[in-house]
């Protein structure tokens, strides 16, 4: 408030602001800095009586201002300088009746501006005899004026003249006593601005000095009561002054109305927000509330999250695989003594394959890219077709899965696990996956076509295997199961239907629909949480598991089959019936380990139980716990110690029976639980088997094909009499209707995309695979 642009004394008695009086027409300079000069110039007033009278009045005025200062600010504010009026020449002030002094007013009735620094003076020093610096006669006025103008031009631009304080060129300004008549004028210089600072000595003494000094910042102290007054502005024409007064009155009238319109709660909230912003140690906290968003927005956000995660996972995985292929080729080239030109050709060939693979990854496959040759298999959730790719003419087996049934039957985890197993290995013991894609209704797995059929077809055709043939197929099954376990998966559905025969007569495992890798995406609970399924949805569609959702198996429930095991003919009838059972929504529990039924946890050793059941069927002719009803089959499996028997009319070796009994036993006593596949390989039944070269050995049976599309080893005749499942038939009708209406089936819904994000896959070496016919 003090020491700023304007310095005024405030009269607490009448509420008026004290302003310095207008000076004589003679211009005065404020004291210069010590470097310029050490003397002050002043106009000597000849009337000594008026000077004495003025001095006495000034003493009274200083006492009154000191009292006003103490009353307004209190005794504690010692750092605030006391305000003193300027010391004008004699006769420039007039005394009014109440004893207070007010500046003289010009003819227009306006108080003259006090923006000029030259109006501020201390009490003048005493006259020093005939010293020309402090006195002059009337004849020296013009000479003194010239000297002042010359000094003003030499000093800094912040030295001003008294005439700059008068506004609008108002006429003559005459004081009350009429002794001084000043011709006012307004200066246009941009430097005519008030700039006054005070030194510490001035503040401590309570006297104002016109000496220019650097500003001294005082520490801010709280004021108990502060009075704000508007500083005087330069005079304006009467018309502009009236407009400003009207605007101020309107603002004052509108301010209470606006304050009354603001609710008290909002005012308090604003104050709290301002207080928090002013607090330097406060932090901003954000609360995540996705539940406030709509369901569609939440689904889209979840889809974006999964897509981003899958994108970076696949990108990193591809970069690692590409680097490994480069290192592998360079290592191979380094082991041969080939020329640099040949090595360069090999590296260039690899680079070309990498480029082709990148283009393939960017290509979106669809059902229209394949031509269906024949349906070679049907199941509960889809079917298997023999297809031919239109652009290359390659033959593949296409497995089609219905998305809606995956939701209803809680098969989302199993589908993801099957895709991960097929895409995560290049083992010769597992069916190769070349592509995988999807549309709005189906999931598609493009796999290699194995024309030899499956092991069930061979059992139906030959009924029994010899021990040598059984040893060969069981040895290859052990190597295939070992590969699955090394990948970190459990098949859980090893049966003759899932053991396929390739074109050379060797076996490969397929149908990993019930496999699990103990990954979060292989757990049914992961997809339940992802889709936020409630209890109503579970009751309407998904099965209500009695235990862990990841242990759910659709092959546990079977239809009742009336069987009598009196002769081989009836066994063949049972096998054909069981083939039909594989095409229906029910499955077969004949090869399931008892610990899976109990929901008490199981490990990889459950697959070795299934191996023992298949070995029993190859040597005896039927499964070890075959019964007329599924309940009886379940009872026999749970009581295997009493129900496992070997018929007397079928002769098998002691080693074969011992291996079967050691596989069909309790999990903690089962062969392979401690040492894995190596423990089974060391059994006497497999004595003489070369485990490293068994795949190069000629197989007991090599399928003979008439063409690459020959399907004689598949039960295509039986499939003609097997109707499509209701879900598949309904989906086919919906697809036809969508095509008629011009709707693209490839436009996926967001909800159905969530569990299948990342399902698309393309194999790198698809162009060089010899298994693709």
From Swiss-Prot:
InterPro entries: AGC-kinase_C, Kinase-like_dom_sf, Prot_kinase_dom, Protein_kinase_ATP_BS, Rho-assoc_Ser/Thr_Kinase, Ser/Thr_kinase_AS. Pfam families: Pkinase (PF00069). It comes from the Eukaryota. Residues 370-686 form the Protein kinase domain. ATP binds at residues 376-384, 399. It catalyses: L-seryl-[protein] + ATP = O-phospho-L-seryl-[protein] + ADP + H(+); L-threonyl-[protein] + ATP = O-phospho-L-threonyl-[protein] + ADP + H(+). Residues 218-256, 265-275 have a biased composition (Low complexity). The active site is at 493 (proton acceptor). GO terms for biological process: budding cell apical bud growth; establishment or maintenance of actin cytoskeleton polarity; regulation of fungal-type cell wall organization; regulation of protein secretion; septum digestion after cytokinesis. Residues 50-111, 177-275 are annotated as: Disordered. PROSITE patterns: AGC_KINASE_CTER, PROTEIN_KINASE_ATP, PROTEIN_KINASE_DOM, PROTEIN_KINASE_ST. It is an enzyme of class 2 (transferase). Keywords: ATP-binding, Kinase, Nucleotide-binding, Phosphoprotein, Serine/threonine-protein kinase, Transferase. Its EC number is 2.7.11.1. Protein kinase that seems to play a role in the regulation of cell morphogenesis and proliferation. PANTHER family: MYOTONIC DYSTROPHY S/T KINASE-RELATED. Belongs to the protein kinase superfamily. STE Ser/Thr protein kinase family. COT1 subfamily. This is Serine/threonine-protein kinase CBK1.
């Amino acid at each position: 408030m003090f020491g700023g642009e304007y310095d005024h004394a405030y009269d607490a008695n009448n509420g008026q602001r004290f302003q310095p009086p207008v000076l004589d027409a003679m211009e005065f300079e404020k004291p210069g800095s010590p470097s310029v000069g050490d003397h002050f110039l002043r106009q000597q007033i000849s009337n000594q009586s008026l000077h004495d009278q003025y001095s006495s009045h000034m003493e009274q005025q200083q006492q009154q201002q000191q009292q006003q200062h103490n009353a307004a600010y209190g005794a504690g504010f010692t750092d605030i300088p006391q305000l003193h009026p300027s010391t004008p020449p004699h006769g420039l002030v007039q005394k009014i009746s109440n004893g207070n002094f007010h500046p003289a007013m010009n003819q227009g009735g306006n108080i003259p501006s006090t923006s000029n620094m030259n109006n501020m003076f201390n009490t003048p020093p005493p006259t020093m005899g005939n010293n020309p610096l402090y006195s002059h006669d009337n004849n020296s006025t013009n000479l003194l004026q010239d000297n002042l103008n010359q000094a003003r031009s030499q000093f800094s631009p912040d030295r001003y003249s008294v005439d700059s304080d008068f506004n609008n060129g108002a006429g003559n300004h005459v004081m009350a006593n009429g002794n001084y008549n000043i011709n006012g004028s307004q200066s246009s210089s941009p430097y005519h601005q008030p700039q006054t600072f005070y030194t510490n000595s001035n503040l401590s003494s309570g006297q104002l000095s016109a000496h220019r000094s650097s500003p001294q910042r005082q520490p801010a102290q709280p004021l108990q009561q502060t009075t704000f007054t508007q500083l005087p502005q330069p005079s304006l024409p009467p018309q502009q002054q009236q407009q400003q007064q009207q605007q101020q009155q309107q603002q004052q009238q509108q301010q209470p109305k606006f304050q009354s319109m603001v609710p008290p709660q909002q005012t308090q909230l604003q104050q709290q927000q301002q207080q928090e912003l002013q607090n330097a140690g406060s932090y901003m906290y954000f609360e995540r509330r996705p539940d406030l968003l709509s369901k569609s927005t939440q689904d889209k956000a979840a889809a974006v999250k999964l897509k981003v995660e899958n994108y970076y996972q696949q990108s990193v995985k591809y970069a690692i695989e590409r680097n490994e292929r480069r290192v592998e080729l360079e290592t191979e080239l380094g082991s041969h003594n080939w020329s640099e030109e040949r090595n360069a050709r090999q590296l260039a060939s690899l680079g070309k394959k990498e480029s082709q693979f990148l283009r393939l990854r960017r290509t979106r496959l669809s059902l229209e890219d394949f031509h269906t040759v024949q349906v070679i298999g049907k199941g509960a959730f889809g079917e298997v077709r023999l297809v031919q790719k239109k652009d290359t003419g390659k033959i593949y087996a296409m497995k089609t899965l219905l998305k809606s049934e995956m939701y209803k039957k809680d098969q989302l985890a199993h589908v993801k696990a099957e895709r991960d197993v097929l895409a995560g290995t290049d083992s010769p013991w597992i069916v190769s996956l070349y592509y995988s894609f999807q549309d709005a209704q189906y999931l598609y797995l493009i796999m290699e076509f194995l024309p030899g059929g499956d092991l069930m077809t061979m059992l139906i055709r030959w009924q029994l295997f010899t021990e040598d043939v059984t040893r060969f197929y069981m040895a290859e099954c052990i190597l295939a199961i070992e590969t699955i376990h090394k990948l970190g998966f459990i098949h859980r559905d090893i049966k003759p239907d899932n053991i396929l025969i390739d074109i050379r007569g060797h076996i490969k495992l397929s149908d990993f629909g019930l496999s699990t890798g103990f990954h979060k995406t292989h757990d049914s609970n992961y997809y339940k949480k992802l889709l936020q399924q409630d209890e109503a949805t579970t009751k309407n569609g998904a099965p209500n598991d009695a235990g862990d959702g990841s242990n759910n198996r659709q092959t546990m429930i079977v239809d009742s089959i009336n069987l009598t095991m009196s002769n081989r003919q009836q066994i063949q009838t049972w096998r054909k019936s069981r083939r039909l059972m594989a095409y229906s929504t029910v499955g077969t529990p004949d090869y399931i380990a008892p610990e899976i039924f109990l929901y008490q946890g199981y490990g990889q050793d459950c697959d070795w139980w299934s191996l023992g059941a298949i070995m029993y069927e190859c040597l005896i002719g039927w499964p070890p716990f075959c019964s007329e009803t599924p309940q009886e089959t379940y009872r026999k499996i749970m009581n295997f110690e009493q129900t496992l028997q070997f018929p007397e009319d079928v002769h098998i070796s002691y080693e074969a029976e011992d291996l079967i009994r050691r596989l069909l036993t309790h999990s903690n006593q089962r062969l392979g639980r401690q040492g894995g596949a190596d423990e089974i390989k060391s059994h006497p039944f497999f004595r003489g088997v070369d485990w490293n070269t068994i795949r190069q050995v000629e197989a007991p049976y090599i399928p003979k094909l008439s063409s690459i599309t020959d399907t004689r080893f598949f039960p295509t005749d039986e499939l003609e009499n097997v109707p499509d499942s209701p879900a598949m038939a309904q989906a086919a009708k919906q697809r036809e209707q969508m095509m008629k209406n011009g709707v693209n089936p490839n436009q996926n819904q967001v909800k159905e995309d969530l569990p299948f994000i990342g399902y698309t896959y393309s194999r790198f070496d698809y162009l060089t695979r010899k298994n693709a016919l």
